[in-house]
């Protein structure tokens, strides 16, 4: 990204706050359209807010241009990632775009919220999806029904760790003896291997719970994979859930991010905003061989526990 070295004069157009949603973007436009639909629904729920949308890649409006426009026309911009896991895009590209906009419009306050993250509201969605799956199965017996939480996978171990936490929480708050984690790419284990293990352990039914906000190429691939597994294991009943971007908890989480930023709640800002590890990443060639777990102290005094061997793949398609 090219950093603007000369500041733009302060804006003189529209005052007030702008909420800028940042979606990942997908090569499959149906996924981008769902994010647009989410934005429209959030505007309808919160008509007092000025809510705008941008994408990191694959769809307009593009993050950098949208952020500069918001900074030009607002007194304050609240940047809220509509993204589940904090991998390279959340830790690198979004904070860099925010820094550019701050340089260009120093008189505009720009605040960056955390991603949605692994949290109780997301767990509530997973539990509800699992109950729906069990109600649809012929034999809703949790002792013979394996569960697979299926995420997109990342080269960032912190993002994968959040997925592992969600799978563990789902296990501890339910009656299922097997709740496993699988990934569609980048890392392991993959869905096919996890299902193979569950069948060998005697599971007669398998519930696949995609950990995705919106549709796209990877959600389409997941449904094809489950169809293949049905053919491979005709004695096993499979249920594949859907993505969960329009659940009420997602709107409530976005509301909370905005409220926390406005109130200045501690830890309401993304830890990677202003993080020095990204400067080191640039020296290493834009971060293609540095790992970063962001294990922050609870009080977050910006004393980061960094392990700089994070591998960031800049174009891992499909939002998570």
Language-model-derived ranges and their functions:
Residues 1-320:
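Active-site-proximal alpha-helix that buttresses catalytic centers in soluble enzyme cores
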């Amino acid at each position: 990204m090219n950093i603007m070295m000369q500041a733009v004069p302060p804006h003189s157009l529209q005052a007030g706050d702008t909420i800028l949603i940042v979606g990942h973007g997908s090569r499959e436009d149906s996924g981008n359209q769902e994010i647009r639909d989410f934005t429209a629904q959030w505007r309808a729920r919160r008509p007092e807010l000025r809510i705008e949308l941008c994408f990191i890649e694959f769809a307009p409006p593009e993050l950098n241009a949208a952020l500069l426009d918001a900074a030009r026309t607002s007194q304050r911009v609240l940047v809220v990632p509509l993204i589940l896991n904090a991998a390279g895009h959340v830790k690198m590209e979004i904070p860099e775009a925010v820094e550019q906009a701050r340089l260009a419009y120093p008189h505009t306050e720009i605040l960056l919220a955390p991603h949605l993250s692994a949290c109780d509201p997301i767990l509530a969605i997973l539990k509800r999806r699992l109950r729906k799956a069990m109600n649809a199965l012929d034999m809703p017996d949790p002792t013979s029904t394996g569960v697979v939480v299926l995420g997109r996978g990342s080269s960032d171990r912190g993002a994968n760790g959040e997925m592992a936490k969600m799978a563990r929480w789902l296990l501890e708050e339910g009656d299922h003896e097997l709740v496993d984690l699988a990934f569609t790419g980048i890392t392991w284990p993959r869905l096919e291997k996890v299902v193979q293990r569950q069948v060998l352990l005697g599971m007669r039914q398998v519930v696949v719970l995609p950990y995705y906000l919106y549709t796209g190429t990877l959600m389409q691939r997941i449904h094809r994979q489950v169809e293949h597994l049905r053919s491979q294991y005709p004695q096993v009943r499979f249920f594949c859930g859907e993505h969960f971007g329009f659940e009420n908890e997602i709107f409530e989480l976005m509301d909370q991010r905005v409220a926390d930023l406005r109130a200045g709640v501690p830890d309401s800002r993304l830890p990677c905003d202003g993080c020095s590890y990204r400067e080191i990443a640039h020296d290493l060639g834009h971060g293609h061989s540095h790992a970063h777990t962001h294990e922050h102290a609870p009080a977050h005094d910006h004393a980061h526990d960094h392990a700089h061997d994070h591998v960031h793949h800049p174009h891992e398609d499909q939002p998570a």
